Every structure is written in C-alpha cells, then in structure tokens.
C-alpha cells in the first residue's frame, strides 16, 4: 500500500507550509488525484486519518478532487480522454499518446487557522 507513504509526504508538505506561512491548525485539505495516478482515493482517506493523528492536520477534513485522464494524440493532433494509461486513442486507435492530465497527485489547497 504505497498510499501510506504518499500521505506521509502530504503531512510533510503541510508541516513545511505551516512553518513558512505561520499557521497552527488545518481545517481542510484538498488533494488532487488523477485517474491515471494509480492511487486509490479510499486508501488515501484511510491512510491520511492514520498518519495525521497527533499533527496539525489531525481533525482536518480530507477532500479529494478527481482529475480525469487526458492525452495528446499525435496522430489526431488533439487532446483525447483516457480512462487507463496505455489504452489506445479512442478516436483513431493509435498508441502515440502523451498524457496531459490525470497523472497528478498534489495538495491543491489548505484551509487553515
């Protein structure tokens, strides 16, 4: 379960921002998770509640923003939707695709006190 180490990284980001921005409590964490990132949202929820215990984010709401997958098809010269990495272009069936969205995992926003 790599989600545990990912959540530990999220806590590190939050603590670093708390020092830099001078806040003492996190009310809400918004995390963007791309459809192609191989991260399970429910596992992230579980792991975040486990690793945030005894931190400034202990009682924070954990909101997940889902980012759909998309890629640039070189053959079609346009952006196409992707449900899974390495699937063919839904329009031409080609495999010359460059992922443009959906592989991210990032802290989008924090609501703090």
Swiss-Prot record:
InterPro entries: Hydgase_Ni_incorp_HypA/HybF_CS, HypA/HybF. Zn(2+) binds at residues 73, 76, 89, 92. Ni(2+) binds at residue 2. Pfam families: HypA. Keywords: Metal-binding, Nickel, Zinc. GO terms for biological process: protein maturation; protein modification process. This is Hydrogenase maturation factor HypA. The lineage of its organism: Bacteria, Pseudomonadati, Pseudomonadota, Alphaproteobacteria, Hyphomicrobiales.
């Amino acid at each position: 379960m790599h989600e545990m180490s990912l959540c530990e990284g999220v806590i590190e980001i939050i603590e670093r921002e708390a020092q830099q921005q001078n806040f003492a409590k996190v009310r809400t964490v918004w995390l963007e998770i791309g459809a192609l990132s191989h991260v399970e949202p429910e596992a992230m929820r579980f792991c975040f509640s486990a690793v945030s215990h005894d931190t400034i984010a202990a009682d924070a709401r954990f909101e997940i923003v889902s980012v759909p997958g998309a890629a640039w098809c070189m053959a079609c010269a346009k952006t196409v939707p992707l449900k899974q990495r390495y699937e063919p272009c839904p329009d031409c069936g080609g495999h010359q695709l460059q992922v443009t969205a959906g592989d991210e995992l990032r802290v989008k926003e924090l609501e703090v006190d």
